């Protein structure tokens, strides 16, 4: 049986490929052989939960945003579901980063999306009553159980 891609499995488009088709420009600094100048209204170092969300808000406000990340950009279809490959591609120090005293390993992301890319498997669905409370109390939009179902 042929491997299905993300769109076939989930019925939604890959967010990275969708972003690129909507005008994202991606550059790999490792490909540069000489210095280059990039212009932006805002430069954000790190593309994890904080940097990524901040970039989206600023871009929607009309600012030109430059995201700078140490690791690679991976599309959903780049994931092979192989831990050994993920360690070298997605983690700081091939998942070998340790606390200063060596007592604890630190599983820190090194890719576009940061540690959120590797921690998504420990995310749980927000209870429906919590989503409803947020909607009633804080007038949130787009976060009903049905609207969140694809994610």
Q: What does each model-identified segment do?
A:
Residues 9-146, 150:
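N-terminal glycine-rich phosphate/pyrophosphate-binding loop and immediately adjacent elements
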């Amino acid at each position: 049986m042929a491997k299905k891609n993300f769109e076939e499995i989930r019925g939604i488009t890959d967010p990275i490929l969708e972003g690129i088709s909507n005008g994202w420009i991606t550059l790999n600094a490792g490909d540069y052989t000489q210095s280059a100048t990039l212009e932006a209204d805002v430069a954000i170092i790190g593309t994890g939960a904080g940097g990524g969300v901040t970039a989206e808000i600023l871009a929607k406000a009309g600012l030109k945003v430059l995201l700078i990340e140490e690791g690679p950009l991976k599309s959903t279809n780049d994931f092979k579901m192989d831990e050994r490959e993920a360690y070298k591609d997605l983690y700081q120090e091939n998942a070998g980063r340790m606390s200063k005293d060596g007592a604890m390993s630190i599983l820190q992301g090194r890719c576009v999306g940061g540690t959120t890319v590797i921690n998504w498997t420990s995310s749980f669905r927000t209870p429906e009553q919590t989503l409803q409370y947020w909607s009633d109390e804080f007038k949130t939009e787009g976060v009903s159980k049905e609207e969140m179902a694809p994610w």
